[in-house]
Structures are given as C-alpha cells and as structure tokens.
C-alpha cells in the first residue's frame, strides 16, 4: 500500500523543508506532544499514500508497515500541507491517524509530519504496528487506522541479568518425581519384594529332591510333589507372582505415563485391597500347612523322624527355606494390604470433605 522514499523527496512531495525550515519543530516545543493525530473529518483525500522515513533515523528506529493493513486517505488543510505539525496537533486531537509522515526535522529528537508532531522517547527501538479497522466503522469515504506502539527498553547490565534469569528454562520435573508419591514408592518396594521372594521360594521348592534310603533298603527319590502341602505352596506362590507382576506393571504405567489400567481411582483402590487381602490369606494358609509338614519331617510322628531316619537332611533344609521365604512373602503382602487400607481411609476422608 505505502511506499518509502528518501528524505530528499520530502520537500517535493509535501513542500516542507528538511533542516532549519519554517515548518521545523524544536525538541523543546514538541517534547510534550504524544503520538496523537488530528481529526480527519475535514481532510480531503488527494489519492496519495506515502510514508517517509528519514535517513537520520533509519538506523535506530524500526518502522514496520504491513502491506495489507495500511489504508488511509486525507491530507492537512491547505496546499501541500502548509499547516505546522505542532499547531495541527494542538487543534485536532484524535486517536486514529489517517496518515503518518515521518521525516527529518530540525531536531534529531523530533519526528514530525502532516498529521501532527511525533515525540520519540529515548529508546533503543520502536515498532509501529498499523492495523486497518473495518470499513463500516469509518464510513464510506473515510478510512481510519488503529496504531499500536511497542517500545523496547535499552539493554542494561541489570536488565540483561534479569532477562537471563527469566529466559533460562526451568528444569523439567521428571515424570518419576511427578507421579511417584511416598505411598507409590512403598508399593513399588512391596510388589518387587513379593515377586522376588515368591520366585525364590518356587525355585528352591521345585529343585528339592533327594533319594530316600536306609542302610538296608533304598526307597527311591523323594520329591516335593509327594507332599500335598508343598504343591499347594507352589501354586499359591505362582498366583502371587502373577498378581504382583500385574500390580508392578500398573505402577510403572502410573509413574512413567501417568495412566492406570483402571480409570476410576475408587474401583482401583478397592480392587487392590480385595486382591491383597485374598492373597494374604492364601499365603498364610499355604505357609502354615507347608510349615506343619516340615515340622513333622524334623520331629517325626509316632517316634519316626523322616529327615533323620531316611537321611533326608538336604531335602528338609530346602523345604524349610522355601517355607520361610513364603512366610516373608506373606508379611510383605500383609503390608500391602495395610497400605491399601490406608489409601481407602484417605480416599473416604477426601470424599467426605
């Protein structure tokens, strides 16, 4: 829309003097004037649409003229804009300029034109953004523009330090610290302990076999599956490993991705509590029954000791180790149940507030 010409063409286009002319405004006289423009109701359009930027201010001032946003008509009264900018500014006050002419005046601190004086403060850079308003707001023949001034403060040591402090990106909080709560950390430890203890108990018990013999007779190989209590212990520990692995995987999803397999926190909490309590009872029953068999193997029944009579010290020791690990698994599962109860209490307290 607009064209930018050199300062030499200012006198030809507007009949104004660039330095020391009659229409030059001194810095003291124009200091009180602000970025305001005269009323355009009495202006007569001349068909020109020119923006002038002086060579003196091009290096220090940045003026952005959007191609599609500047559309204005009208000049000052009189031939070639003979009225002085300061007088025009005093007579006509309007917040919407029709056209802004910026050229070099007598003072380096004042930029003036046909539509009024413009006082530039001591800033490092100034950007003018021109936005065209809808035609309905300006009528059929008059078109106004909306002016926005964006000022950038000069660089100072204190300002640069403050800007550096603001621009330094804050460290992103890791997802592990974001989603992992103290109760979640305890759940991690409990689930991992359940998996490890149950797995070791299964390995020790399944590898337990020994030949049963006496000095006179060889009865063959004695294995764990010959005892129903030991088979029950293995079955319960397998179920515990499967359940604890699912819970551990869900905790990993919650910590890393922030999502859960069960969307509802109420259903998830009550489900965890129910299964924890179920496997706590199963571990207790399996461990006590297997412990009873191990005790009978050591002490014997009706005066007959299985371990000492048939030289099964290794078999009995392995069975005792597996039963002991199963008891530790029960204690960890009981701790998980207690933690689930605590979560339910916290949840109920939050709901009743």
From Swiss-Prot:
Region spans: Disordered: 1-24, 70-100
Extracellular topology ranges: 206-250, 299-320
Membrane-related topology note: Multi-pass membrane protein
Biased composition range(s): Basic and acidic residues: 7-20
UniProt xrefs under InterPro entries: CASP/CASPL, CASP_dom
GO cellular component terms listed in the entry, alphabetical order: plasma membrane
Membrane-side (Cytoplasmic) residue stretches: 1-184, 272-277, 342-353
Subunit structure, interactors included: Homodimer and heterodimers.
Protein name: CASP-like protein UU7
Natural source organism: Physcomitrium patens (Spreading-leaved earth moss)
